[in-house]
């Protein structure tokens, strides 16, 4: 059995979808959690797919916004400069190069800030999109739909004609809320939202993408 959808563009999450940044994320946040006396595992369970500032506000409820912002800037610098182990995930470069070669619109839509996202993007050697949505551009981060709605708007496409590619539950929720098609990559099988997505993938190279004469894109996956 083969899954198939028609779309006109792609909206990719970055961390965990296109780029393996898990070693950096775990190092940074475990160090932060220990310095604040917070359970590191609780922090790592919370952060996936969310903006860093959201995590800090959650775990620093007794701190002022000024203190939280100062801590965010310190953590941002650590994450933007620690690039050891950053690499493109299997199939990511090949898929993006295929989209580029066929003039298929695509964007990166990340919960990361500009310094962190751009540093990891460069370190992984990914092609550069014309549209790169970061945390600074939206009022509400994932799981709210704002980032994916903005990504679709900047591509000049209706959300329902965009395929969101995500690895995080918060991002999948954001894509669904935006009204987009959704492909879930390397997501735990018990994630409830998998019942609502269009594709469930182990890696990106499971997708086949074909541009049609009418500029629609046929996306398939062998089961």
Indicate residue ranges for each PLM-predicted region:
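Ser/Thr-glycine-rich phosphate-binding loops at phosphate-binding pockets of nucleotides
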Residues: 17, 21, 110, 171
């Amino acid at each position: 059995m083969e899954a198939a959808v028609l779309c006109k563009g792609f909206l990719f999450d970055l961390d965990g979808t296109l780029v393996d940044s898990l070693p950096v994320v775990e190092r940074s946040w475990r160090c932060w959690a220990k310095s604040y006396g917070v359970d590191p595992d609780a922090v790592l369970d919370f952060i996936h797919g969310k903006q860093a500032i959201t995590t800090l506000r959650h775990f620093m409820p007794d701190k002022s916004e000024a203190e939280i912002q100062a801590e965010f800037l310190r953590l941002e610098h650590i994450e933007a400069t620690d690039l050891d182990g950053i690499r493109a995930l299997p199939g990511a470069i090949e898929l993006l190069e295929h989209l580029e070669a066929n003039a298929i619109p695509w964007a990166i839509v990340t919960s990361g800030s500009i310094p962190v996202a751009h540093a990891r993007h460069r370190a992984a050697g990914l092609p550069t999109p014309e549209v790169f949505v970061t945390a600074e551009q939206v009022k509400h981060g994932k799981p709210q739909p704002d980032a994916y709605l903005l990504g679709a708007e900047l591509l000049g496409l209706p959300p329902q004609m965009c395929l969101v590619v995500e690895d995080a539950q918060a991002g999948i929720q954001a894509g669904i809320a935006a009204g987009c098609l959704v492909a879930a990559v390397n997501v735990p099988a018990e994630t409830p939202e998998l019942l609502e997505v269009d594709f469930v993938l182990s890696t990106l190279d499971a997708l086949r993408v074909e541009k049609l004469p009418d500029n629609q894109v046929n996306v398939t996956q062998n089961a």
